[in-house]
Amino acid sequence: MEPFQTIRQGIIDRYSVLVDNPTEFAEAIHKPLKQSFRINTLKGDKENILEQLRNYDPEITEVPWNNNAYVSQLNNLGSSLEHFVGQIYIQELTSMIPPVVVKDVIDNNAILDCCAAPGSKTTQIAGMMQNQGHIIANDSRHARLKSLRGNLDRLGVTNATVTLRDFKSFPNTEADLYLVDAPCSSEGTIRKKNAVARMWKEKDYKRFTKLQKGLLNKACEMAPSGSTIVYSTCTFSPEENEKVISEIIDNQSVKVENIGINGLKTSPGITEWNGETYDKEVENCMRIWPHHNDTDAFFIARLEKC
């Protein structure tokens, strides 16, 4: 068996017990993803851009739960003129979820994107805000700032400030929304071969969990009462998802808000895994399984600071 097939089978074996339909889950893991993208209305009218894109692919389809997200049968839209000038942004559908679940709190507000590079969510939110309000786009790795700044510039974002700092030592900063799209084991991207194979070799849940808790604790500590904190990962691992949230509930004055998106099939967070029991509030978290919406896997929690 090829190494990547072994990786897939390991994921199927570990997580099939959590899903509603193990057969469909396994089939989805082996299917490649279609290319998805969103239209950047900072650089043009949506319908005009769509008309241009349909010259390449007449079968482009809108995603039912996000009226600015689309799926194409082509896999080379990243080479198109529309991508080059910033009218579209190639992005996995699940990566677009965090801004969608906080669209009620972003207008003209202050936002801190704690782990921003390469800028997928920063640019998405800037587009939703139409460059109003202010976004601090922080990342801890200098090597990733080039892609972050490049994407902000290409997409015409003017309301973002880029910072380079380990977020755990970031100065206390009041904001209305904190995004913690945390580094993770990336298991949920198994349908994209190259992204996962590299991460799977260092499958160290404890290491990631420690990092994730540090980032989320910092965001919760600096967040003022009434503000929103969103935590997300692209992994199946409960150790990096529900366990992190459960421990944050124990240590911070936060509550987990119940979230849902019309047109998107989701599952609640799990409360038991490998002999551990998590706080019942984690059921308000959102899990996305690959076989439910033909996407990557994803986890998201929306917290309110009390």
Task: Identify the residue ranges that each predicted region occupies.
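S-adenosylmethionine
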Residues: M1-C306
